[in-house]
């Protein structure tokens, strides 16, 4: 049984401010997970400043997004099916995945979100995620604040 997924593709590199015409929603189908794989349903996706720099052909510290393919970014998802004992169905994970409603990933590309009742899970895409780490390094290692 395959899982129907929706993906957001970059159609062409924007000239100036990105518009809806630069993107398209496409259908895809994911197979059931094999040993060591986990099927997740993405709940939150992060839209970060570095992504605009990847919407160009210019060389940078990270490769540009591929055209006619899902954009990539950090996400939080709920495990739907798991073929790995470390990831229970229903648990929350973070990953770097395509902009898609669902993703099939190997266990090494997933990180469990700890159960912290007072902290909303989406904070792991902001202050407790890559943007927060970037800010911390910038303040503590570069600016010496």
Q: Language model features by range: what are they?
A:
Residues 1, 26-28, 103:
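Generic detection of short hydrophobic beta-strand segments and adjacent strand-loop junctions
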């Amino acid at each position: 049984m395959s899982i129907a997924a929706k993906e957001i593709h970059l159609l062409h590199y924007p000239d100036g401010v990105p518009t809806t015409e630069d993107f398209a929603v496409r259908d895809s189908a994911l197979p059931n997970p094999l040993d060591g794989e986990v099927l997740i349903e993405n709940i939150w996706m992060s839209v970060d400043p570095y992504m605009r720099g990847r919407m160009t052909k210019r060389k940078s510290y990270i490769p540009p997004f591929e055209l006619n393919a899902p954009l990539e970014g950090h996400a939080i998802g709920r495990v739907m099916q798991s073929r790995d004992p470390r990831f229970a169905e229903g648990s929350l994970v973070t990953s770097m995945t395509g902009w898609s409603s669902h993703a099939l990933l190997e266990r090494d590309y997933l990180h469990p979100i700890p159960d912290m009742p007072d902290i909303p899970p989406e904070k792991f895409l902001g202050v407790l995620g890559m943007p927060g780490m970037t800010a911390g390094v910038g303040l503590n290692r570069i600016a010496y604040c």
